[in-house]
Curated annotation (Swiss-Prot):
SUPFAM superfamilies on file: Ribulose-phoshate binding barrel
Family per similarity comment: Belongs to the TrpC family.
HAMAP family, A to Z: IGPS_A, IGPS_B
Gene name tied to this protein: trpC
Name of the protein described by the UniProt record: Indole-3-glycerol phosphate synthase
Species classification: Bacteria, Pseudomonadati, Campylobacterota, Epsilonproteobacteria, Campylobacterales
Listed pathway(s): Amino-acid biosynthesis; L-tryptophan biosynthesis; L-tryptophan from chorismate: step 4/5
Catalytic reactions on record: 1-(2-carboxyphenylamino)-1-deoxy-D-ribulose 5-phosphate + H(+) = (1S,2R)-1-C-(indol-3-yl)glycerol 3-phosphate + CO2 + H2O
InterPro entries the UniProt entry points to: Aldolase_TIM, Indole-3-glycerol_P_synth, Indole-3-glycerol_P_synth_dom, Indole-3-GlycerolPSynthase_CS, RibuloseP-bd_barrel
Top-level EC class as recorded in UniProt: lyase
Provenance organism: Campylobacter jejuni subsp. doylei (strain ATCC BAA-1458 / RM4099 / 269.97)
Keywords recorded for this protein, A-Z: Amino-acid biosynthesis, Aromatic amino acid biosynthesis, Decarboxylase, Lyase, Tryptophan biosynthesis
C-alpha cells in the first residue's frame, strides 16, 4: 500500500534529520524563533453561514503526480491569504508530494493566518520541527497511529502551543480520535490506502462526533452547493488543495467558493 511506502520513506528521512540536527539542538533554535502559534480554533470555528477554507499549497500527489508545474509556494500562499483563506496547508513531504519544510518557513515569514504542517507525522521531533518552521497546527493521521501514539502526539503538540488536525476515514479512526482527545477532526473523503473516494462520509460520521469538536471536510471539494450541504451537516471548515492547484488563478477559485 502507498501509505506504507510513504511511512517507511518518512522514517528513513527522519532518522537522517535527527542525526544532522539532534532533538536538543532543534529545541534550542526556538530561542531565535520570532513566531508564536496563532489561534487555530478561532480561525476554523464556523460562525453562522461563513465558509472557512484551509487552502493547500501542493505541487504533487502519489495518485496524480505533478499537479502544478509552475509552482511558486509563496505566491500561491499570498494569493490565498489575499482572497480570505482561513488558514493555509503546506505539504512538507518531499518524495511523494514534492513538499518541503522550507516552503513552510518561507510562507510563515510573509503571511499572518494559521499554517498547517501537512505531513506523515508519527514522532515528537516532527511536531517540534513544525513549530520551529512556523506551523500553528499539524496533521495527525489516525490510520497511521495507535490510540496511545495519537494521544501522546496530541498532548505534545498542545504542550508546545500547537493544535492538531486529526484525520479520519472510518468509524475506527473516529473512535481513536475521540478517545485520544482530538479537538479538530478532519473527515477525509479519500481512502489513503487505495485512493477511492466516498463523498457520503461526512453524512455517515458527523452524527457520531460530539458537538464540541471542530469538523473539517477534506478531498474532492470543488462545488459551492456541496460545501453548503456539508455545512448544514455540521462541517466547520474545508481543506481544499488539488482543485485550486489545477486552476490558473487559485485565489479566484478560492474566492468563488466563499
Amino acid at each position: 500500500m502507498i501509505l506504507d511506502k510513504i511511512f517507511e520513506k518518512t522514517k528513513e528521512d527522519l532518522k537522517e534529520r535527527k542525526l544532522k540536527l539532534p532533538y536538543d539542538m532543534l529545541g534550542r533554535s526556538l530561542a531565535s524563533n520570532p513566531f508564536f502559534p496563532k489561534d487555530v480554533i478561532k480561525a476554523l470555528k464556523r460562525v453562522e453561514k461563513e465558509v472557512k477554507i484551509i487552502a493547500e499549497v501542493k505541487k504533487a500527489s502519489p495518485s496524480k503526480g505533478v499537479i502544478r508545474e509552475d509552482f511558486d509556494p509563496l505566491s500561491i500562499a499570498l494569493n490565498y491569504e489575499k482572497n480570505k483563506a482561513a488558514a493555509i496547508s503546506v505539504l512538507t513531504e518531499p518524495h511523494f508530494f514534492k513538499g518541503s519544510l522550507e516552503y513552510l518557513s518561507l510562507i510563515r515569514r510573509y503571511t499572518q493566518i494559521p499554517l498547517l504542517r501537512k505531513d506523515f507525522i508519527f514522532d515528537e521531533y516532527q511536531i517540534l520541527e513544525a513549530l520551529v518552521y512556523g506551523a500553528d497546527f499539524v496533521l495527525l493521521i489516525a490510520k497511521m497511529l495507535s490510540m496511545k501514539e495519537l494521544k501522546k502526539l496530541l498532548e505534545f503538540a498542545r504542550h508546545l502551543g500547537l493544535e492538531a488536525l486529526v484525520e479520519i476515514h472510518d468509524k475506527e479512526d473516529l473512535s481513536k480520535a475521540i478517545f485520544a482527545g482530538a479537538d479538530i477532526i478532519g473527515i477525509n473523503h479519500r481512502n489513503l490506502e487505495d485512493f477511492t473516494m466516498d463523498m457520503s462520509l461526512c453524512e455517515k460520521l458527523i452524527p457520531k462526533i460530539p458537538n464540541s469538536k471542530i469538523i473539517i471536510a477534506e478531498s474532492g471539494l470543488e462545488n459551492k452547493e456541496f460545501l453548503e450541504y456539508l455545512q448544514n451537516l455540521g462541517v466547520d471548515a474545508f481543506l481544499i488543495g488539488e482543485y485550486f492547484m489545477r486552476e490558473e488563478d487559485e485565489g479566484k477559485a478560492l474566492k468563488a467558493l466563499l
